[in-house]
Regions:
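Short, conserved catalytic or interaction motifs in soluble domains
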Residues: 76, 98, 150
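An N-terminal-biased, well-structured beta-alpha scaffold segment characteristic
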Residues: 1-94
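Glycine-rich Rossmann-fold phosphate-binding loop(s) that bind the pyrophosphate
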Residues: 153-154
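Phosphate-binding beta-alpha-beta segment of Rossmann-like dinucleotide-binding domains, i.e.
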Residues: 97-147
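Hydrophobic Val/Ile/Leu positions in short beta-strands of Rossmann-like dinucleotide-binding domains
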Residues: 6, 148-150
Length: 154
């Protein structure tokens, strides 16, 4: 069974799956480990499951044990990993592409609706106990009959 180091705490279902598939080393306290700690914890491992909070720069990658064959990034991108340094060490790097595409679109719609209906102002007013009715209080913009286009930028 392949041994992997998982740098950050995952949801229970993911940790259970990792336990069935691999011999995992978990970061049970979900601490943001230093680069030297990541190097130390990955000794004897075949792979590392990083998150976007882990800086895997050239110096860190160059110091990883020779047993490391893969860095899997628990993120959509690779901004935290020096891909060229990994390539020079023949370390495969993967990510989780498109896993957040639908969620990102949904949050975009949420933000549009919240802005049009002045949701943040309403929440703040309710928290402060300042909810004062009037015909035009926090009326916002009604979207019924509005044509809306959403363009992706990623």
């Amino acid at each position: 069974m392949k041994k992997i180091f998982i740098t950050r705490k995952l949801i229970k279902e993911s940790e259970d799956k990792a336990t069935k598939t691999f011999d995992p080393i978990f970061n049970v306290n979900d601490e943001l480990y230093s680069q030297s700690k990541v190097i130390e914890m990955s000794k004897g491992c075949d792979g590392i499951l990083t998150s976007l909070t882990d800086r895997m720069d050239q110096e860190t990658i160059n110091k990883l044990p020779d047993t490391i064959k893969i860095i899997s990034n628990f993120a959509v991108g690779f901004g935290n990993i020096d891909l060229e340094a990994a390539k020079k060490r023949s370390i495969t790097v993967t990510n989780t592409p498109e896993v957040l595409s639908d969620a990102t679109a949904e949050i975009g719609i949420l933000l549009i609706l919240g802005a049009c209906r002045r949701a943040a102002e309403g929440i703040e007013s309710a928290k402060e106990g300042g909810w004062k009715w009037s015909a035009d209080y926090l009326i916002g913009k009604q979207l019924t009959g509005t044509r809306l286009g959403v363009l992706g930028m990623g």
